[in-house]
Amino acid sequence: MKPKKNTGLVTVLTVLIIALLIANAAVLYLQFQISKGSSAPAQDATEAPTTEATVPTTEETEPPTTTMPDPEHVVSTATILSTGDLVMHIPVINTGLQNDGSYNFDSIFRYITDYVSEADYSIANLETTFAGTTNGYSYSGYPNFNCPDALADATKKAGFDMLLTANNHSYDTTLVGFKRTLEVVRGTEQETLGTYLSPDEQKWTIKEINGIKVGMLCYTYATGVDSKGAPQLNGNAPMSEAGLCNYFTYDNLTRFYDEVQGYVNDMKAAGAEATIIYMHWGIEYITYARDQEKAIAQKLCDMGIDVIIGGHPHVVQPVDLLESTVDPEHKTVILYSMGNAVSNQRLGNISSVSTPHTEDGVLFSITFSKYSDDTVYLEGVELVPTWVNLNANNGSRQYNIVPLVDSERSEWMTKFNMTENQFNDAQRSYDRTEAIVGDGMTKVQTYLEQEKQTREENYLLAVQSAAQGAQ
């Protein structure tokens, strides 16, 4: 008989074997996937995980910066030099006569040419005429002046840019000399101010100096005026034509003020950033300003004029600082009289002169500054006293305008070819002028320096405030 088969046990064993094979295959598959996904070795379970260090960027470590603009600052300056009366008496004219009959007046200016040429623009007051000698006139001094044309050549050579032609001697040689004077001066490429060839000429000028536009006016007093409006100068008959001279009369200042105010408005409308007026006024030989001139000056200040420079008294008069009664922020610098640049008005030479002050004059320099915001300010005023030295030390007479700088006093004798007596006279001249202008110059310079300091501090504060607001 055959033995009986155990089929149930076989079935169970078969199922277990298949299950083990499937589980083993699953483990192998999982290990393969893990090794495929990461090539890094397995991390030891006992080590702490590491973190890679990162370098912070500039933006993360520093606050953002704000570029601070520069404060407003000076971008250009214009220095204008003015000097006093060129009074050509016959003794002065005669010193210019050359052996060939021509004239040369270069020696008058020989010691001031550096000052004149170094300024950006230089101006002198021409107190004579150039009528020539072919129009019924000869060369003459007081009371009716007529000088050789060579004086205009000498002022040009010395570095002057403009001659003031409105004064009480403008009409000394009537209309022919009046007009020829303008033609001669303009023919040397120097400008004129105050008198005109035609009534249609503009009665003011604007000079653009280093980018700064300076408006200028020049007026003379007149002793009368006719029905046509033509002025009477120096007691002569009224001019034969009206509209050729800027003038005023003390008995009708309203007309003068109205006219000047109109011209000031016109100059500003035409772009003037600063204004100067030259006034031929006052009384001869007094070293102080009268109430009449002070009142006129105050009115001009109230019109907004920046600088007033006077002439005619033939002596130096004070410097002052005026405050506008209309706009307290506006100030005007004034030199009431520049004195004589050159003349023969010397103590002992002329009976009408009883003071040595007629030998004294000044080189008066004003400086306007333009800032980067296009505003213009009067920022500097300087004054060098001058003395007219009648020098005959080399055998020929010369009238020399001598600049008297106190710090160079020890050099005066050698530098200006002076005798000891002349040196002593020069020292007295310096002291006279300093006594007249010293206090006023200190007042003006102190004010201008304080204003500049305050202005630049305010500019800096404005920049700092803007920078803080931008943060």
Residue positions per predicted region:
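N-terminal targeting leaders characterized by basic, low-complexity, disordered sequences
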Residues: 1-7
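Long, compositionally biased stalk/linker segments
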Residues: 43, 47, 52-59
